[in-house]
Design a protein with these regions (language model features):
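Conserved class I S-adenosyl-L-methionine
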Residues: 115-123
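N-terminal chloroplast transit peptides
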Residues: 8, 20-43
Length: 281
């Protein structure tokens, strides 16, 4: 007997290829629930009312911090590792994220040696980007809103003998300083749409030369699939997921004195990310 989740995945497989490509925004949330959880669509009014009551008392920042300090840390730490304790959807997300990280590393390598250059990685997670950049010789300042994530990144770096990377706990708005390069990868999905331009502006204020940012783009089919995901309540619905208008991001970069130099789209079955590299002009 198929569960509601299995039925949904079966339906996804029959969609047009462009519809199958999905961002972390919707199906990822369902896929990351414990495998033993039973999902069934709830009445729209019940789901909406419950969500409204929760969101009126818990702001985005608190929600994200609590999630990634608790059950979210355990799930995503497995995804961002070589652990075999992941399902096919989680493995697909891992592959997509790894592709984004590799593209950034390739771009930076193509621009020459970064040994001694300063890099600020905002929303560093477990160090997926910060650690390889440190191995390339960059001086790393990496932060995450989650103590658990930042500590895990620091432990991984220490185990590798890395000494040129500092990891600490901070939200995006509180990050200060000046750096050659500022990165913010797969973080904007947790950031409110109406504050996106302001956040991009802040990241730019930290960068002397370059900003790299990725986000889940706002398109009609991702909006549709996000709505489908919202029909499935339960423990997996832990944080709000935001899709962003690419033009808003580009306008914010331009306003801050940056110009997009390179861009890339990474898409797998359950991961979709738009990556922009902007340089100061």
């Amino acid at each position: 007997r198929l569960s509601a989740r299995s039925l949904l995945f079966s339906e996804i497989k029959q969609l047009h290829p462009t519809m199958k490509t999905f961002s972390v925004a919707a199906l990822a949330a369902i896929a990351l629930a414990p495998n033993t959880a039973a999902f069934s669509p709830a009445p729209r009014s019940v789901t909406a009312n419950a969500r409204s009551a929760l969101f009126s008392t818990v702001d985005d920042k608190t929600e994200v911090r609590e999630y990634f300090n608790n059950e979210g840390f355990n799930r995503w730490n497995k995804i961002y590792s070589e652990s075999d304790e992941v399902n096919n959807v989680q493995l697909d997300i891992r592959n997509g994220h790894d592709q984004t990280i590799q593209k950034i590393l390739n771009w930076i390598s193509d621009d020459g040696d970064i040994a001694g250059k300063t890099v600020c990685d905002c929303g560093c997670g477990v160090g997926s980007l910060a650690i390889p950049l440190a191995q390339m010789g960059a001086k790393i300042s990496a932060s995450d809103i989650s103590d658990a994530m930042a500590n895990e990144a620091a432990d991984r770096a220490k185990a590798m003998g890395i000494r040129n990377a500092k990891f600490y706990t901070s939200d995006l708005e509180s990050v200060k300083g000046k750096y050659n390069t500022v990165t913010c990868v797969d973080v904007a999905i947790h950031y409110p749409t109406e504050k996106m331009a302001e956040m991009v502006g802040h990241l730019c204020s930290l960068a002397d030369e370059r900003v790299l940012i990725s986000f889940a783009p706002k398109t009609w089919y991702y909006e549709l699939l996000k709505k489908i995901g919202e029909l499935f309540p339960g423990p997996s619905k832990t944080t709000r997921a935001y899709l962003h208008d690419e033009q808003v991001v580009r306008d914010a970069l331009q306003k801050a004195g940056f110009e997009v130099a390179r861009e890339e789209m990474t898409g797998t079955s359950f991961y979709f990310s738009r990556l922009l590299e902007a340089k100061r002009v």
